[in-house]
Regions:
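Noncatalytic alpha-helical scaffold of FAD-dependent oxidoreductases
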Residues: 1-416
Length: 416
């Protein structure tokens, strides 16, 4: 187990610098430097299984860590942490490993090891003219962390990142290595499961329970993703009438309003997001409206996400100022709204990878999301605005993002 390195008790801090604590043991997991991809993957699986077996035998706690986007100190209660960001193998399975009932192109399948970052997977796919089906607001999460914690997606009619998953390789203990997929849509066959030394389980309920499970089912070692041909997203980021925003946030009836996107008249957006300043809620909100277009033969990366057009460090920016000037939340956000919110964009086109890209967060920032039914959106927003008005200011901005309901049992996006 030279690939598993025990660093002993260590201070651990999350990416947003909002949580810090002492772990009982910081464990660094890595793959072998020699051998085929499959050999490396299986050797690491054996290491992880042995590590879990020892932990269970000694009745200790252990949990994997991905991109350090955790927001809770629960992980530090006498718990060992496995850092997985070196576990980045990925490959496309062969046709012989695919279930014969799977009629789609097997080249639209990607098997990714748990520590692979969304960004690296997107680059890998981009080089093959492929794309993830959806993304969160940025790309710093590991694939296992993103799905098991229910990271939101970006597509109105698709869903979250975890909704593109068609199989999970979960290690529970020594000699307990499973590949779980839906019985109603089995994508891989016994040959694939055997190649990663796993027992194949076809079970819809088990799959939906394990998909968003915060690691409670075991160590998610590998994730089978269904991807698609790359596509462009045409971006309109503009202020829209408050009355139109109120209609859309409860109905998504785009034909009932007049959006500033004349070239896309009659088309349903791929993505719709509203940005609201809670200290000036009667102002026309900023809307980010994206339309899906076929991918090009050749692609030249635009400057769409440069600081000049979209301030990717908005949360960190707010945090730095308000930390140094307590009580300045309302004043700062109102004065600097034009710098905090994205600038107007008109018909700029980019791949999914370049549209939802890097986010740099500095300072002790906190971001959270709650899932609500579509028809309760305006009511929920009104409650949040009243809370801020009644109980003091919070250095925050609100973003409303609309995604399809997920079948994952613990997904926060469980409402229609």
């Amino acid at each position: 187990m030279d690939r598993i390195k025990h660093k002993g008790p260590k201070q651990w801090t999350n990416l947003h610098e909002s949580v810090s604590g002492m772990t009982s043991d910081l464990i660094i997991a890595d793959n072998s430097r020699v051998g085929s991809i499959l050999e490396k993957y299986n050797e690491t699986a054996e290491d992880i299984a042995q590590l879990l077996a020892g932990t269970l035998q000694n009745q200790k706690k252990i949990r994997p860590c991905g991109g350090k986007w955790s927001i809770t100190p629960v992980a530090f209660d006498k718990t060992a942490i496995i850092e997985t960001d070196h576990l980045t193998l990925r490959w496309t399975p062969t046709l012989s490993e695919v279930n014969p009932t799977f009629i789609d192109d097997h080249k639209n399948l990607l098997f990714a090891q748990c520590g692979a970052k969304i960004k690296s997977l997107s680059i890998y796919l981009r080089d093959r003219k492929k794309s993830l089906k959806a993304s969160g607001a940025s790309n710093g999460q590991t694939i296992a962390g993103a799905i098991s914690c229910g990271t939101h997606g970006s597509a109105i009619d698709f869903g979250s990142i975890h909704d593109s998953v068609v199989g999970l390789n979960i290690i529970v203990n020594k000699n307990k290595n499973y590949y779980i997929q839906k019985a109603t849509r089995p994508v891989m066959n016994e040959t694939f499961a055997a190649s990663i030394q796993a027992t194949l389980i076809n079970d819809d309920k088990l799959f939906n329970a394990a998909l968003v499970s915060m690691g409670c089912f075991g160590f998610i070692h590998g994730v089978m993703l269904e991807v698609e041909d790359w596509f462009m997203l045409k971006n309109y980021t503009k202020n829209i009438a408050l009355q139109d925003a109120e209609i859309l946030m409860n109905t998504l009836q785009f034909d009932a309003v007049n959006l500033p996107v004349s070239a896309e008249s009659g088309q349903r957006p791929y993505h719709f997001k509203l940005l609201i300043n809670p200290f000036n809620p009667t102002k026309n909100p900023k809307a980010e409206i994206l339309y899906k277009k076929p991918g090009p033969d050749k692609y030249v990366r635009p400057a769409l996400n440069d600081e000049s057009t979209y301030p990717k460090d908005s949360l960190g920016f707010i945090a730095k100022i308000t930390q140094n000037l307590p009580g300045s939340d309302k004043l700062i956000i109102n004065l600097l709204e034009s710098s905090i919110f994205p600038k107007d964009v008109n018909e700029a086109e980019a791949l999914l990878y370049d549209t939802f890209s890097d986010t740099s967060l500095h300072g002790k920032t906190f971001a959270c999301a709650i899932g609500i039914p579509l028809d309760k959106t305006h009511q929920t927003l009104s409650c949040l605005l009243k809370l801020i008005d009644d109980h003091g200011s919070v250095p925050a901005i609100f973003a409303l993002r609309f995604i399809k309901r997920s079948n994952a049992i613990l997904a926060f996006s469980r409402f229609e």
